[in-house]
């Protein structure tokens, strides 16, 4: 599987935030999920709007799935909507993350364009990415140990 990693793009506004970093902490925590990140928030932000959009198109084009962060949407809604609309136009599935540490509902624009919404949980996120990017169903089961008295 490491020879064929899932290619993903995580929404950004040319700056990393806590949620952006957290996505990769969750993905790396499993130790068995291999991915290639095509997003480049650390790159120099293009000056004009059309150059920004062209740069985002270039970053999204090679990916198999797009991860949308509501925190980035709050910072730059127009930019995130462009990223989501381009992903849809390019036939890329979208996994939207719930708001981290909050019960606040996702913005309607995100819910309407997302193919799947994932909780902030390593297993849920990885399963959603596998389902959307490669149509792989996981066969994991939860096991609960309990003692009878």
Regions found by a protein language model. Give the residues of each.
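A short helix->loop->beta-strand "cap" motif at the edges of active sites that frequently abuts
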Residues: 89-97
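Short beta-strand/turn micro-motifs composed of small residues
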Residues: 12, 70, 98
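A charged, well-structured terminal subsegment
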Residues: 125-144
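Glycine-rich, charge-decorated loop segments at or immediately adjacent to ligand/cofactor-binding or catalytic sites
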Residues: 101-117
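Conserved N-terminal substructure of TIR/SEFIR domains
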Residues: 1-62, 142-149
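Inter-motif core of Ras-like GTPase G domains
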Residues: 64-68
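Conserved TIR/SEFIR loop-to-helix hotspot centered on a Trp-containing motif
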Residues: 72-89
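Structural motif corresponding to alpha-helix initiation and N-cap regions
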Residues: 50-53, 81, 122
């Amino acid at each position: 599987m490491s020879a064929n990693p899932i290619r993903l793009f995580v929404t950004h506004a040319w700056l990393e935030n806590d949620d952006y970093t957290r996505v990769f902490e969750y993905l790396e925590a499993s130790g068995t999920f291999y991915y290639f990140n095509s997003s480049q928030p650390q790159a120099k932000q293009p000056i004009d709007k059309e150059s920004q959009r062209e740069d985002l198109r270039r970053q999204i084009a090679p990916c198999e799935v797009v991860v949308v962060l509501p925190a980035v949407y709050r910072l730059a809604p127009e930019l995130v909507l462009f990223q989501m609309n381009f992903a849809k136009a390019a036939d890329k599935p979208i996994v939207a993350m719930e708001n981290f540490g909050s019960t606040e509902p996702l913005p309607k624009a995100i819910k309407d364009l997302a193919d799947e919404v994932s909780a902030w949980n390593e297993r849920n996120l990885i399963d959603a990415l596998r389902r959307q990017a490669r149509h792989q169903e996981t066969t994991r089961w939860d096991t609960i140990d309990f003692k009878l008295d």
